[in-house]
Regions:
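Conserved cytosolic catalytic loops of P-type ATPases
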Residues: 37-58, 62, 224-317, 417-461, ...
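Bilayer-spanning, highly hydrophobic alpha-helical transmembrane segments
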Residues: 105-113, 339-367, 381-387, 396-397, ...
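Conserved ATP-binding TGD loop and adjacent catalytic N/P-domain core of P-type ATPases
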Residues: 9, 26, 507, 535, ...
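Membrane-embedded alpha-helical bundles of multi-pass transporters
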Residues: 123-134, 159, 178, 182, ...
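Actuator/coupling domain of P-type ATPases
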Residues: 63-78, 82-88, 115, 126, ...
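Flexible metal-binding regulatory segments at protein termini and peripheral loops
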Residues: 1-131, 156, 224, 239-242, ...
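P-type ATPase nucleotide-binding
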Residues: 443-571, 581, 593-611
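Conserved catalytic phosphorylation-site environment of P-type ATPases
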Residues: 281, 340, 377, 387-464, ...
Length: 739
């Protein structure tokens, strides 16, 4: 027997058409779950997408599409790379929205005209029997032409043993239409429900149009992001300049970018200088000065000068494409709370059908005369007023808008689960270097011991550190280069994680590192002096201390404000660093972190253990970092937040990525999460409260007090407004501003 357990899982996201309610979502997920090779499937009603994790050696894209089609739905057009054909898909959705509005207005207009005749029979010179015959034709058109969507979808569901919202609408309108048809055919003068059936269809269609329009507004963030990408680029090849489609760019191409143009790819400037509007990344509208050697990001606007850049990441590898992809994935994901809602909505429609049947039977047996119209009114009102759509849209629409608003503010959320988790955070751990500080340290003092000069101290230290990528090492090498010091070769290089480096330089064994590393190696550090606020890098030659380099890293100007906002949000704020306690306390005092919340002299391999310690005390921990050595702690934390300017591995280990390096985005992300979850709770309270309150009203519980039964037409209006209210409430998140 062949085991597939070791095969890596693949993931595919497909746009699905034809879904109308939570029951549709549940049916597609069931069909996908039954397909051999599918590990997990999540279908999102708001984004109209199915995200599938599967074993590629057991099922491929065509098999997944076949499962969706077997459920009775279609997959939208795709390119060869699997990406949706955005323009064609959006045009198709625009056409569908226009058709919905047209049919809604026509059906409602016809229904209201028939209702006017029914309510004012004296206004027509014919007996009611003839009026019923005249109304049969327009009622039939509305029922089977404008209402074809509901009938076809309901029939499709019944073939698979599923009851959906379309089933409710179809049952309700067909019952009203069928009863009215019977009254007309037998020539009775009793009132009919042709008008109610037509108005119901018109109002439900109008609700669908409003819902589709609101969902389109919520999904506009991705379209807006992709519109930032230029369609052509000015490429320099073989000494000639030519405009090429953006899809033909290659990594390594030289590109000229003129004022007023958007940068076509990620890369670095090789010639010229300018100021770039990077508001799409940071939210800050002030242009950022760029010159040769500086990195530029595709989609940003060149505000002033002309420059030549070298493309490094093009097409789907650019930051802009990755942001759009992350937003799309987050919008398509399910928050844990949604899975509970799905379990309820899966049973909702069958329960509504039973309630409608019970109401019909009750009023038929015990209702006022004439009993059959009363029973029909109650049953149709129950079927029509029930709104599974509102429950199905309550969570995904809020996640969709919240993720999009986050992207606009430079906060990339990986999933709905991350948005839900962020509002539970009670403690935030901030890594020092690159998070609280700029991550660009510089040597501010050289303290050679007797018998060693500053030049010799710097030369030996820089030669040994040249093989290291640590920010402190780069600061030492940068100072040596700036002073024009020629560095001798280093051999036997060894990097000690969290400690320093060892190498052989000029035949001498050089150790450059922290005080702790030297103590572990038995070197005396009694003569070492370092000013407060400086990181001391000690240099040892052949076991003897020869001096110290004092290195300082500037605190980010917004760090203190970020810490203040975190405290204002009732969060514990901790600092984690491998630096000396004296340095950490000096920085903590500057930004507002108390000494008892500082974890200093922590090795990289100990960072995740410190996170565990806080979790063991009951804290829900968010870890914020940017370096490779932060990845284990980010993964261990309840919520990993990566500074986007940091290492790729840190970004991969995190649930939230900050595009820029502004630390104020951390409290903003938590505030956004709280606002999103508050909106979800409001939506769910409305959706469940609406159904729990109005379904009994539609069934007639107020009849003993009021003497009337709810009109099916009013029920249709209430149902249409219910789902629209949920989407509209979610759209309020577009106005979110961090405080």
């Amino acid at each position: 027997m062949i085991s597939h357990a070791a095969a890596p899982l693949a993931e595919l996201s497909l746009p699905v058409t034809g879904m109308t309610c939570a029951s549709c979502v549940a049916r597609i997920e069931r069909f996908l779950a039954r397909a051999d090779g599918v590990e997990e499937a999540a279908v999102n009603l708001a984004t109209e997408r199915a995200t599938v994790r599967f074993h590629p050696d057991r099922i491929d894209r065509s098999g997944i599409v076949a499962a969706i089609e077997a459920a009775g739905y279609e997959v939208a057009a795709q390119t060869s790379s699997g990406e949706p054909v955005a323009e064609e898909t959006e045009r198709a959705r625009d056409a569908e929205r226009r058709a919905l509005l047209r049919d809604a207005l026509l059906a409602t207009g016809i229904g209201l005209a028939m209702m006017a005749v029914s309510m004012w029979p004296g206004g027509v010179p014919w007996p009611m029997q003839r009026v019923n015959v005249w109304m049969l034709a327009p009622a039939t058109v509305v029922q089977f032409v404008f209402g074809r969507r509901f009938l076809a979808a309901a029939a499709r569901g019944l073939r698979h043993g599923e009851l959906t919202m379309d089933t409710l609408v179809s049952l309700g309108t067909l019952a009203a239409y069928g009863y009215s048809l019977a009254i007309t055919l037998i020539g009775s003068a009793d009132p009919t429900y042709f008008d109610s059936a037509a108005v119901i269809i018109g109002l439900v269609l109008l609700g669908r149009w409003l819902e589709a329009r609101a969902k389109s507004q919520a999904a506009g963030a991705i379209r807006a992001l992709l519109r930032l990408r230029p369609t052509t680029a000015r490429v320099l090849r073989d000494g000639r300049e030519a405009d090429l489609p953006i899809d033909q760019l290659r990594a390594g191409d030289l590109l000229r970018v003129r004022p007023g143009e958007r940068v076509p790819a990620d890369g670095s400037i090789v010639e010229g200088a300018s100021a770039l509007d990077e508001s799409m990344l940071t939210g800050e509208s002030l242009p950022v000065d760029k010159r040769a050697g500086d990195r530029v990001t595709g989609g940003t606007m060149n505000a002033s000068g002309s420059f030549v850049m070298r493309a490094e990441r093009v097409g789907s590898d650019t930051t802009l494409a990755q942001i759009a992809r992350m937003v799309e994935e987050a919008q398509g994901s399910k928050a844990p709370i949604q899975r509970v809602v799905d379990q309820v909505t899966a049973r909702f429609v069958p329960v509504v059908v039973l309630v409608a049947a019970g109401a019909f039977g009750f009023w038929l047996l015990l209702g006022p005369e004439p009993r059959l119209p009363a029973a029909l009114t109650a049953a149709v009102a129950v079927l029509i007023i029930a709104c599974p759509c509102a429950m199905g849209l309550a969570t995904p629409t809020a996640i969709m808008v919240g993720a999009a608003r986050g992207a606009e503010a430079g906060i990339l959320v990986r999933s709905g689960a991350a948005l839900e988790q962020a509002q539970r955070i009670t403690a935030v751990i901030l890594d020092k270097t690159g998070t609280i500080t700029s991550g660009q340290p510089s040597v501010v003092s050289l303290r050679p011991l007797a018998g060693t000069t500053e030049l010799e101290l710097l030369r030996l230290a820089a030669a040994a550190e040249r093989g290291s990528e640590h920010p402190l090492a780069e600061a030492i090498v940068r100072l040596a280069a700036g002073r024009g010091i020629e560095l001798p070769p280093a051999t036997n290089f060894l990097s000690v994680a969290g400690g320093g480096v060892q190498a052989t330089v000029d035949g001498r064994r050089i150790v450059v590192g922290s005080e702790r590393l030297l103590i572990e190696q038995g070197v005396s550090v009694d003569q070492i002096e370092v000013e407060d606020g400086q990181t001391g890098v000690l240099v040892v030659a052949d076991g003897v201390s020869i001096g110290t380099l004092g290195i300082a890293d500037h605190v980010k100007p917004e760090a203190a404000e970020a810490v203040r906002r975190l405290h204002a949000a009732s969060l514990e704020v901790w600092m984690l660093t491998g630096d000396r306690m004296a340095v950490a306390e000096a920085i903590g005092a500057e930004v507002g972190i108390a000494p008892d919340r500082i974890l200093a002299e922590v090795r990289p391999d100990e960072k995740s253990a410190k996170v565990k310690e806080l979790q063991a005390r009951g804290a829900v921990v968010a870890m914020v970092g940017d370096g490779i050595n932060d990845a284990p702690a980010l993964a261990q934390s309840d919520l990993g937040v990566a500074i986007g300017t940091g290492a790729d591995v840190a970004v991969e280990a995190s649930e939230i990525t900050l595009v820029g390096d502004d630390l104020r985005a951390v409290p903003a992300a938590i505030q956004l999460s709280r606002a999103t979850m508050r909106t979800i709770r409001q939506n769910l309270a409305w959706a469940f409260g609406y159904n729990l309150l109005l379904i009994p009203v539609a069934a007639g519980v107020l009849f003993p007090l009021t003497g009337w039964l709810l009109s099916p037409a009013l029920a249709a209006g209430a149902m249409a407004l219910s789902s629209v209210s949920v989407v509209t409430n979610s759209l309020r998140l577009r106005r979110f501003r961090a405080s």
